[in-house]
Amino acid sequence: DKKKIVFVDGEDTNMFVEDRVKDGVVYFKRELYPDQKQIHLQEYMQHVLPISFAFPTAKVNKGQKKERRVAHSDPRDKKTYVFEKEYEYYHDYKYSKYAFTMPKAGWDCLRHYEIMGNGCIPLFPDIMNSPRYVMMRFPKALLTKVAFFDKNDPKWLDQNYEYFQAEVMDHMKKYNTTKALAEHVMKELSLINK
């Protein structure tokens, strides 16, 4: 019974596993945006749904008293990747107000969620260009505002940091933890299987 099969495609590309799409099974796709090479699959898309990374619920940390404006780790400069242990990497975010992030192999990457999960606000300069069905439960509108003010009025952004951090953390807990993702997937499956 196809209703009992769920396929989760976590690949960093937007290409589909054609046989699974054509099988008609429920297909969760992380990098879900059109590719003209697979336009012939359009008729099979009724069971394809977006999915994203999530941060472990037990590891969510509001952060500490902020010691610096921007985290040392910066994906735009590989020389800043100096941490060998997860706790060192997370410590950098916990004590920073903001941290830069960007697409990695695909638009969705765990780094975005690690930043938020450690009480830090992602600075994602190109977030407004992300495809519509990628990172559907990510706070894109909120982080578009943050990116705008970081570029045009960083002093105002810093004066309103507590507000934006609270908004990011509220969103994170509601939509971007592993528990929230599991609940969302189960809800989607219950709607499809009616």
Model-identified regions with their sequence ranges:
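Nucleotide-sugar donor-binding catalytic core of glycosyltransferases
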Residues: 1-166, 170-193
